A protein has these predicted regions:
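Conserved donor-binding loop and adjoining core beta-sheet/short helix segment
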Residues: 51-152
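Structural alpha-beta junctions
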Residues: 112-120, 164-176
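Short glycine-enriched loop/turn motifs at secondary-structure junctions
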Residues: 15-17, 89
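Short boundary motifs at domain starts and secondary-structure transition points
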Residues: 13-14, 79
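Well-ordered, non-membrane alpha-helical segments in soluble/globular domains
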Residues: 101-110, 158-169
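Short, intrinsically disordered terminal tails adjacent to the first/last structured region
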Residues: 1-12
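A conserved beta-strand-loop-helix scaffold within acyl/acetyltransferase catalytic domains
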Residues: 20-83, 128-131, 157, 161-162, ...
Length: 270
C-alpha cells in the first residue's frame, strides 16, 4: 500500500517575474512521444484521456528549458456555469522528473499558462509516493479495533523525495485537498500495488505473485480459474469495440449489486 502526495490546488496568481522554464501548447504527437520515452506515466496524462473527458476542454502542454522539452501535461479545463472562467485540472501530473526539476520554476510557469487561458485556479496530482505499508501490516491493522484509518499505522517506509516535494509545494502556496476515506477531490491518495518483481529486480513467477496476496484473493482467483474465466487481448480497435458491450453489461450489473452509479457505454468508447 502506498500513499501519494495529496491532490493540491492553487488559486492562480499573477506572475511577479518570468519563469526560467516555459510552458506552451504542444501537439498530441509530441505529447505521446515524450510519454513513450519515459519509464512510466499515468494513462490519465495521455491525450486519449482528454478525449474520454468530453465535458472538459483539453490541452497538451510542454515544459521547455530553452528548446528542450523536459516535461508534459494534459490540462483539462472545466467552465463554471454562466461565466467564462475555468478550473484547470492536471490529473496524476504534470509528467516531470519530480526529484530533479525546479518546482519553483515549473509550477509558476504552468500557473501563468492556464491563467492566460482563463483559469481562476489549478489542481494538480503529483505522482510521487510519500509512504508505504506492507500488505501484512495493512491486514493486521484491519483486524485491530484501535486502528481507525491507515494513517494510524506507522509506515514501513517513508520516501524522503516525496516528502521533499510535499514540503516545497506548501512553501510555494499550494494547498492539499482534504481526503475523505482515502479519497480527495481527484484520484485516490492511497493505492495498493502488487509487486511483479523481487527487491533485486527479478521477475516473479505466478506462484510468487499469488503468495503475496491474502488468502481470500488467492481463493477467488482459483475459483475463477475453475469456473473457466479467461482473460484475452483484443486484436485491434474493432474487435475491442465489439467486446465492449459485453463488458459494459457485466459492469452495469456490478454497479446495481454494489450500489454505485455506472458510466454510460459511450464513456468507454474513445
Amino acid at each position: 500500500m502506498a500513499a501519494r502526495a495529496a491532490v493540491t490546488s492553487l488559486t492562480v496568481p499573477t506572475p511577479t517575474r518570468p519563469a526560467p522554464l516555459q510552458v506552451r501548447e504542444i501537439d498530441e504527437a509530441t505529447h505521446r512521444e515524450h510519454l513513450a520515452a519515459r519509464a512510466s506515466a499515468s494513462f490519465l496524462q495521455t491525450p486519449g484521456w482528454g478525449r474520454v473527458k468530453a465535458e472538459w476542454r483539453r490541452e497538451s502542454v510542454g515544459f521547455f528549458d530553452g528548446e528542450s522539452l523536459v516535461g508534459v501535461a494534459l490540462v483539462l479545463y472545466r467552465q463554471l456555469p454562466k461565466v467564462k472562467r475555468f478550473l484547470a485540472y492536471v490529473p496524476e501530473g504534470p509528467v516531470l522528473d519530480w526529484g530533479e526539476v525546479d518546482l519553483a520554476s515549473a509550477l509558476p510557469a504552468l500557473a501563468a499558462h492556464v491563467k492566460a487561458r482563463g483559469a481562476f485556479g489549478i489542481r494538480i496530482g503529483p505522482p510521487v509516493v510519500t509512504a508505504r505499508w506492507s500488505a501484512q501490516q495493512v491486514k493486521d491493522g484491519i483486524a485491530d479495533d484501535d486502528v481507525r484509518r491507515l494513517g494510524d499505522l506507522a509506515p514501513t517506509e517513508r520516501d524522503t523525495a516525496g516528502a521533499r516535494v510535499v514540503t516545497q509545494l506548501r512553501e510555494l502556496g499550494w494547498r492539499p485537498q482534504v481526503a475523505e476515506g482515502g479519497f480527495a477531490a481527484g484520484q485516490p491518495q492511497f493505492v495498493f500495488q502488487v509487486p511483479l518483481r523481487d527487491a533485486d529486480g527479478t521477475a516473479l513467477d505466478e506462484d510468487a505473485v499469488l503468495k503475496g496476496m491474502n488468502q481470500l484473493w488467492r481463493r477467488n482467483i482459483k475459483k475463477a480459474d475453475k469456473l473457466g474465466v479467461e482473460v484475452t487481448a483484443s486484436e485491434g480497435r474493432e474487435e475491442a469495440l465489439a467486446r465492449l458491450e459485453d463488458f459494459h453489461d457485466l459492469y452495469v450489473h456490478t454497479a446495481e449489486r454494489d450500489h454505485f452509479t455506472p458510466r454510460p457505454l459511450s464513456y468507454f468508447r474513445v
